[in-house]
């Protein structure tokens, strides 16, 4: 048996030994961070667990003195280890890692606070408060204001009633709490904490300096945040900071009742730097408030205590801005020069100040400022120049004067020299872009002279390497366009030639075409257009542009040629800039402005018809309203060209134009009555013009033309009912009647050319027309005259037409006696040429007898004089042949008819006497045989004499 078994251990382990062991192990892990593989997150978790356990144990029973001392020793070791970890670069990490380290740091004062204040530890409460203060600052640096405030609030009660030597910790806590409140946005609390710290700061100059720094820090935050609380003003905070600096610098500021620790005399801190910072921020606050005099006062005070080499660069910037705000540009210029002479001023600050100065001074001062910057900025001179030029450009007012100042500024050799070297490639490109954009703005404003100047200066910043070739060519082309707009055509040609040398392409070729057109050199324009078509980067759109340019220059030939060539490029696969139908329309529109172009217009109209047949109506003209407009344009154009050609007696063209019009009108909306009516009219007009061409050219129609005409009239005949207007309108009805007559007349004409006799059909055609409402006496007269002419006259049709003409005319309310007289004459001539009833004389006599019945009772002058004279003379002369044949009875009948007509017609009164004498002589010679054909009783008076035989008219 072992001794231990005989004498067992009855001693109890100390309380909380397990917690102490865990804590000791955790502290050891924290201390051995270089060799330990324990993750900081695990260390923080272990410490949280231990703190929770200790807090639970402390709540149940108080710690013994020895346990408190143990915890204090371990807490102190933990703090020292945390400090070592913070100083180690091996643990540097991101915000998350720093937050874990801050949590480990805070565990040390938490342990000390749990352990209580043991006896024998000097200033234990102040030490714990200091640890909490530094832990809170760590959280504050990480932006965790809530955790920082919690640390400060735990520390404050520990030292709030501390002895004099520990009051410094309380001051630091108040300043830290003020900073946390400021970061949280509670500026009022921050100011209250600072005010609460004034008695603490009064104990020593260092305390006053710390409080002044606190006021300055809170003032900066207030100024940056532009706090809206009127009770918290940045200027008040800066003034408080200045006052504290003054008190701290005063020898009487240290209280005799607060002797320094160890009996040493307090040393006055160096507050000049802090005072200058306060003055700078106070000047900045006054500058934001636009109190320019206040700014200048602050700067004077600041400068009174320092030399030029010590002046902060912001002083010069604020002084310059204050003088600008006061309107004193001369002093502002001096301040800018002083700033540039300050070695502490960065190049960026100098450029920013120059920008602000130029914004107020205007572009006139830019040259001087930029030259000064060129001398000041060694490394970033090009970037500075870019910023200055941009400020001048963006300074407002894009006038010509500003542009001229920019051009002079960027063309200075010293400025251009800043951009030399490969290191300034970016700045060089930026400067070029600035000038290019400025130039294009003036170009859009049509300030072409100014635009050309700026674009030309921008080329100073374009290198001549291969990469910049395209940019240089663009500049040359824009310069050419500017000079074209200014009508400096020779100069424009020089620039475009340079552009072509740098980068030959279609844009240059087009500009040459444009220049030649404006110079009126059409031959050269033609040559350049051919060159343009042969370019590698040829685009059909440039032919469209050429056509527009040629039209504006009134160069008809070039415009037509460009559109004609463009038309030849259309195919199913190739994308084109505009629809083929639009090209055809523009081309025809151009041709229609010039005389004698009917053949060309007809050619392209035929092409439109053919393409419509090949592609389909919608594929060629387009769909919807736009397509309908295009189609109607071609239809109306064909109709109008047909009318124009007919008016100019170019019947060959006119007929085909009307035929094309019919095709266009019939190609869409076949069910539309209006379109079908137009088709009918166009077909009738086409045949009408065809017959007119035959008559004008005195050449008979070919069999194919006759066949085509018959087909067109047959097609039109089916559509004739659609011509009549749905709403009776006099003008529309008259037009419809005219087309119905033309259809009848043309049909009659073509029937006579068919090669086979068609007299019955012709007669029936006229009868049908005579029975229609469209028939007029004038129409029937024309039909009758036409039927009586030609190689194969249709006498029956002629007689019917003429008789119907007379009947229709007499039946009207206002008979047209000129038409009636013409019909009577033609009918009389017909009667003289044929034997209707076996007796030629009887038929003719019937006509004259009808004429006599018509003229009896007419007013004087109502019947045409010349026609009346013809009737009288013809009737009288009809007696000549019977007299020679000794047919006295027939002769007497005709002489009597002539004499009776003369008595009722105007213009024959002077001849009645001689006619009466001749008639009486005839009766005397032939005996007293009664006249069976007498119309009236013979005159009682005997008239001797003879009447000359009138000529048959």
From Swiss-Prot:
Q: Where is the composition biased (Polar residues)?
A: 943-953
| Gene3D superfamilies for the chain | Tetratricopeptide repeat domain
Q: Does the keyword Lipid biosynthesis apply?
A: no
Alphabetized, the UniProt keywords read: Chromosome, Meiosis, Nucleus, Repeat, TPR repeat
Annotated localization: Nucleus; Chromosome
**Superkingdom as given in the UniProt entry:** Eukaryota
**Is Membrane one of the keywords UniProt gives this record?**
no
Q: Name one GO cellular component term.
A: nucleus
Looking up InterPro entries in the UniProt record yields:
Spo22/ZIP4, Spo22/ZIP4/TEX11, TPR-like_helical_dom_sf
Give coiled-coil spans as residue ranges.
Answer: none
Q: Name one GO biological process term.
A: regulation of synaptonemal complex assembly
Q: Where is the region Disordered?
A: 248-269, 924-953
In which ranges do the TPR repeats occur?
129-162, 432-465, 473-506
As for what it does, the entry says:
Required for crossover formation, complete synapsis of homologous chromosomes and bivalent formation during meiosis. Is specific to recombination events resulting in interference-sensitive crossovers (class I meiotic crossover) and works cooperatively with MER3 to promote crossovers.
Name assigned to this protein: TPR repeat-containing protein ZIP4
Q: Give the organism the record lists.
A: Oryza sativa subsp. indica
Instruction: State the encoding gene.
Output: ZIP4
